[in-house]
Each structure stands twice: as C-alpha cells, then as structure tokens.
Amino acid sequence: PLQTPSITIANNAASIASGSNGESVYTATYTMQSSDNTGVIPFSVDFKDLANNEGVQIIAVINDVDGGVTFDKQAPSFTSVTISSDNSNNTALAIVNDEITLELTSDEAIITGTDPTITINGNNASVTRNSTTSFTATYTMSSPSDDGIDGSVIPINISAYSDATGNVGTTLTATTDGSFVTYDKTLPTLPTVTISSDNTYDHLAASGDELTLTIASDENIN
C-alpha cells in the first residue's frame, strides 16, 4: 500500500479522484486551461509507501503505456480563400446562371464530418472535400433569389469547421487574397442612339455623304 501520491499534470497539481492511504489504486484528474502549453502533456507521480520509503518518480511520457496525450488549443484556420466566377468575359463578374467557386486551404486537417458550412450570398453552397486541408464550394447565381445584390460584391460566409481535437475555427467573411465577384443581372441599355449625315442638312444624305451613328450606353460595353 502507498501513501496518497503527489501528482502533477501539465505541471499543475492534479486532484486525486479516488484512493487514500492504504489503498493501491489512484486516479488523478486535471482540466486543461488555455494558459497551458501545447504539445505532449507532461505528468509526474511522486509516491511513498506506508513506511515512508520513497519510490522512483514517474514522469511522462516514457512511462505512459498509451503513448501520451497531446494538448492542442490552436483552432484551425483557412490560410487561402479565393473566389471566382465562370463568367466567360471576366471571372470577377457574374450574371444569372454563372457559377461562383470558392477554393479553400486550411493550415491543418479539418476533421471528417465537420466540413465547413459555406454560404454564397446567403445561400448554402455545395462543398466538396478534396483532401483533409482542401475544399471547393460552388453556387450558381439565380433570379429572383439573388436579385437583391445586383451591382454589389457577392458576400461569403465560412463557418462550423473544426480540427481533430474539436477546436472550432473562426467564421470568415472575406477572401485572403482580396479577390471578389460582383453580381450584375441588369441588362445594358442604349439610352442615346442618334444618326446624322455630313450633308449640309444633317438629316439628309446624298450619294457620297457619310453617315454617323452615335451610341451611348448606360454602362461599359464589352
């Protein structure tokens, strides 16, 4: 039988959950704190028998038959987030039926079953897991559901993802490289269209006169 041992976990005094003088089985517990160091959690056990003979101190992790426990308090994050459109003229613009694509790369493995929840303009995107650290999200713009942001940058939201330890990542609402896509569903118009002749009377034309058609649009025309 032993005296109640002195036990530390993560260099902090542990609570002896069971066992007392004269018993041979003890359980020690400690709740990890945000101030504790990351990495393999050290522990130590100092003990004596009832005759006060001191045993050889046990320390982590060489004496841990389970291989130790690693403390991870770092939440995962996406170090690369880019957005683009499959618009045939400009990948930074989108019209109705254009597909928006988000490409994401995380700094550590995202646990299976906690793939990020991603919305594009408030609509749930289809998320594909390419690897434990790589994801692709897509959404096709539609009318009238997306009409409210006509002429605006398409908002994104990335949330509800975690690593193997259970650390939850921060919600993201912006790309990492400054990329963006602007939604434009308004058809261009030509509010001003005039025709004239270089004839003395510009509303008349004779053989050899040059006609000029002047067009003004309400936005840039490709």
Tell where the protein language model's regions lie, with residue ranges.
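Non-catalytic beta-sheet/beta-sandwich ligand-binding modules that flank or precede catalytic cores
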Residues: 1-222
